[in-house]
Amino acid sequence: MKKGCLENTNNAHPKNFGLNSSGRLEWLDFGKAMGILVVLLVHAGCRLGLVTYYGGMFYMPIFFVAAGYTFRVKKGESYGTFLLKKAKRLLIPYFGTSAFLWVFFWVKDCVLGGTPGDLKLASLFGILYSRNQMWRGGYTGSNPVLMNVLNSPLWFLTALFLVYAWYGLISKVKKKYWLLGGGLAVSVIWHYVTPLLLPWSLEAVPYFTVFFAAGEKLKEWGGVKTLTNDIRLGIACLNFFLLLGFLSGSVNLSCGNYGVSMLLYLAVGIFGSYTIFVIGDRLEARCPKIMQVFELIGRQTLPILCLHMFLYMFLQTGAGVLGLGDGLTKTVMVVGSLVVLTAVGYGWEYVNKRKRPLRP
């Protein structure tokens, strides 16, 4: 997930965008932290009623919206250079993490199991295909899990890369919104014509790009302060989110399930993301100490996304050895992953900074 930094291009005071003294967008980091927290809760198997139900309404769209808010192409930067930067940011973690997990389970299951010749080709295919399954949820035929080495959350990285690729291509075109709408129509038609899920979420990328565009539009409107300065707008976002989310039903974007309507869920995801951002902006003013914790987590959503399932395996095993109950085990999995992987993320940043040569 892209770091919550924003270049002020409108000659406005940074506080009008919700920037703190370090140039961070704390409410944006809060939104990403809330999104990754719901990811952890869902993947740990937590069932918290309305919390996980409504959390499931925004926890993936909010990352697309946040990425759209921070989207920019530097003046004079070529499309190829832009794509290369996004590939380094998203595809290197994707293939690096996937390769690590594949090697780990190949050694664990095959080498130590006495069958080193078994190269887990199905797992390699899943890594290249980058979808949890080939057919939409509910498909009655054979539909095996493709990303089966605890790498299932990583589908998001390839999808976001293609969203950047598509939006970067159309962003400078005068008929950008026509192309955006046309792409959305293709996604919707594909969804209702065939249950086939294409590699790298190709059939869904134009759909996800609408969430991305909603993030950029929020920036054009003046940022989250536009919603918090007029309380009626913030309340309207919340009410639309709660009502439309109730009507939408459960979703699972990784499996191509959008609830009762793809278009309805677009509104749910956008209003839900805006609502979480408003809450973050309010907390920033009223509970700065709490926001500092969320900011720490929100800046490290990439390592948490990539490795939490792997860490879950060890935490769950350890909890079983200690005889912990189901509820306490899930708590250990969620909290332990947040603490350990946030620390890992900052440790990795520190090492990289030490490697960089000092500027003269």
Range-by-range predicted roles:
Residues 1-360:
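Alpha-helical transmembrane segments and their immediate juxtamembrane cytosolic regions
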